[in-house]
Amino acid sequence: MENANKPTFQNVLEFVRTFRRKNKLQREIADVEKKIRDNQKRVLLLDNLSDYIKPGMSVEAIQAIIADMRGNYEDRVDEYIIKNADLSKERRDLSKKLKALGEGEYKEEK
């Protein structure tokens, strides 16, 4: 009887290892994609900055351009923080709903 369960247990262990590896790869891929996007944005930012800065501009004019760009980016960050909070709240609400649904099914089985 024990021998009959052993291959099944090994199959379960292999499934768990494979599933964990797949999840780890997904996280690593997402991390690398984020790094690619971040660096592409940096390149674009430098290109945009080069378009604004002209020969003979004063240091004050360049600083004003940078300050304006910084303000715009800070506004975007604030918007994304608010959006992320809204999404997190919705995720928590769905988790509570799923938990309640799961508990309801468990009670019905008894």
UniProtKB/Swiss-Prot annotation:
Belongs to the pole-localizer TmaR family. The keyword Repeat does not apply. This is Pole-localizer protein TmaR. Residues 15-42 form a coiled coil. GO terms for cellular component: cytosol. It is found in: Cytoplasm. Keywords: Coiled coil, Cytoplasm. The keyword NAD does not apply. Pole-localizer protein involved in the regulation of several cellular processes. PANTHER family: UPF0265 PROTEIN YEEX. InterPro entries: DUF496 (IPR007458), UPF0265 (IPR053375). Pfam families: DUF496 (PF04363).
